[in-house]
């Protein structure tokens, strides 16, 4: 074990900038120029979603010890919850219970726990005495901010450092973020964290939110960042966050060993520590982290793997609660394409809190509309082969530009398809319907009718609705669906008329 992390050897053998010549800085200690960046490990808390927090008592102690020796600035040891004490799990009923897993030599490491106001009785929280956790990170939704901040206030009065961690900051408007920051300033906690709950953050989102918060949050409140791997961007975003070099602001980045956390996982702390060592003069001991991964985390991942997965990318793409993706995955008969289309149809008011009944309604409707339309497509493909198509939409410009449209038809002799109506002033070769209400109002059918499978009633050609409806804002628009069909059938050129209100984008 000569090459392993040795608790009896707490010093690095390399002198770093800021250290006295020949006297290296001990792990966990930072010189004045380095004090504004902290690395927080959340393996025992966020990683616990993988194994129901059942790490085992000795494993918990060893993970905490390894992270402490590695020089991690903040080690989160689990949740404060209203649960019966189980020494093998990192969910604690009292601070007294968790003291048994903390090392005797704390090495200036801050130890933290996380709490939700409605899952933990604040009256059970003992006053801070310096021998338990130092920091309590409190999460709250946009609908219970007042209750969350009141919990923060009470914990702060008991002597703890507090971090306010609002859930899904991507769901806040700019005005909402500014209002929240104003309330946090009144409380004046130790830290405020930008939490990308659904893993939906892009670079421009990070830039916007960091700018809003940094320019309005009191400068002596540390700013944290908690990311997820839904879109495989957590390491890139964390680097960007640090490279902003926020003036006069302490910052904290959350990460976990091997990125352990609910699929797809979190930012890998070993990667982040290495990046900080190379670029910010830090001296985290990567070996201690790698030992903990090998001894404790890899055996868990063999039983319950995590990592990038398309359904969780899609849940992030639409900024949805992750349980929607898991719910549709559990059906067992949906492709990633199917899940994409289902997630795209979730109403805005249903996105943040998972609604199983609502999800089942979407699933049932989706299944009802799914058909095999290969024969209909093959027949249409033959009829459309080599033809230019004129798509008519029911806009007022059909009347105001009637002469121009007639001239185009006479000159180009296109095959004419009307979208969701039968034109009165033009002769259509086909009518394409995606709306049941429009279809039911047909008094006569002067041309063959193409209808999608969501419509009840007889049509000459029935086409699968789900394969034509796109997973984007106008994906279920009849004209867009018609163009989708034409592209699928190999039509190379189409003209539009009556598409009032549409632009080239």
Task: Identify the role of each PLM range.
Residues 1-2:
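Low-complexity/repetitive intrinsically disordered segments
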Residues 17-21, 272:
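Short Gly/Ser/Thr- and charged-rich N-terminal loops/segments
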Residues 20-33:
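Short, Lys/Arg-enriched N-terminal segments with co-localized hydrophobic residues
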Residues 31-36, 383-386:
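Extreme N-terminus of proteins, especially the signal/transit-peptide cleavage junction
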Residues 34-374:
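Catalytic cores and adjacent flexible loops of soluble metabolic enzymes
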Residues 371-505:
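Metal-ion/cofactor- or nucleotide/acyl-coenzyme-handling active-site neighborhoods
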């Amino acid at each position: 074990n000569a090459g392993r992390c040795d608790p009896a050897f707490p010093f690095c053998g390399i002198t770093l900038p800021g250290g006295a010549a020949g006297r290296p800085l001990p792990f966990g200690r930072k010189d004045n120029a380095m004090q504004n960046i902290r690395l927080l490990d959340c393996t025992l808390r966020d990683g616990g979603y993988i194994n129901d927090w059942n790490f085992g008592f000795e494993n918990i102690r060893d993970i905490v010890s390894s992270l402490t020796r590695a020089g991690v600035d903040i080690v989160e040891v689990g949740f404060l919850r209203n649960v019966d004490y189980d020494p093998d799990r990192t969910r604690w009923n009292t601070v007294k219970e968790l003291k048994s897993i903390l090392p005797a030599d704390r090495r200036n490491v801050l130890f933290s726990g996380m709490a939700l106001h409605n899952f933990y009785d604040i009256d059970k929280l003992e006053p801070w005495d310096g021998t338990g956790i130092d920091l309590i990170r409190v999460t709250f939704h946009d609908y219970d901010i007042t209750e969350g901040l009141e919990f923060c206030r009470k914990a702060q009065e008991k002597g703890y450092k507090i971090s306010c961690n609002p859930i899904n900051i991507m769901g806040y408007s700019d005005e909402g973020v500014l209002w929240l920051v104003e309330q946090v300033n009144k409380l004046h906690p130790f830290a405020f964290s930008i939490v990308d709950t659904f893993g939906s953050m892009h670079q421009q989102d990070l830039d916007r939110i960091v700018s809003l918060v940094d320019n309005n949050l009191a400068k002596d409140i540390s700013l944290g960042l908690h990311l997820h791997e839904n879109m495989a961007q957590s390491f890139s975003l964390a680097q960007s966050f640090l490279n902003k070099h926020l003036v006069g602001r302490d910052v904290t980045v959350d990460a976990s060993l091997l990125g352990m956390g609910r699929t797809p996982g979190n930012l890998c702390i070993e990667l982040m520590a290495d990046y900080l060592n190379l670029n910010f003069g830090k001296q985290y001991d990567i070996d201690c982290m790698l030992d903990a991964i090998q001894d404790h985390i890899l055996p868990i991942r063999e039983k319950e793997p995590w990592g990038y997965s398309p359904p969780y990318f899609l849940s992030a793409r639409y900024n949805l609660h992750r349980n929607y993706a898991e719910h549709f995955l559990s059906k067992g008969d949906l492709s990633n394409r199917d899940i994409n289309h289902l997630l795209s149809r979730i109403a805005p008011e249903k996105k943040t809190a998972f609604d199983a009944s609502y999800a089942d309604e979407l699933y049932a409707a989706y299944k009802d509309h799914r058909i095999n339309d290969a024969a209909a497509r093959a027949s249409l493909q033959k009829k459309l082969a080599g033809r230019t198509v004129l798509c008519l939409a029911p806009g007022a410009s059909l009347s105001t530009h009637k002469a121009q449209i007639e001239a185009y038809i006479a000159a180009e002799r296109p095959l004419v398809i009307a979208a969701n109506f039968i034109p009165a002033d033009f002769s259509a070769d086909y009518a394409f319907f995606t709306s049941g209400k429009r279809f039911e109002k047909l008094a006569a059918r002067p041309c063959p009718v193409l209808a999608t499978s969501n419509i009840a009633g007889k049509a000459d050609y029935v086409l699968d609705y789900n394969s034509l409806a796109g997973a984007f804002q106008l994906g279920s628009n009849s004209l867009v669906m018609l163009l989708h069909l034409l592209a699928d059938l190999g039509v190379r050129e189409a003209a539009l008329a009556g598409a009032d209100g549409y632009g080239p984008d």
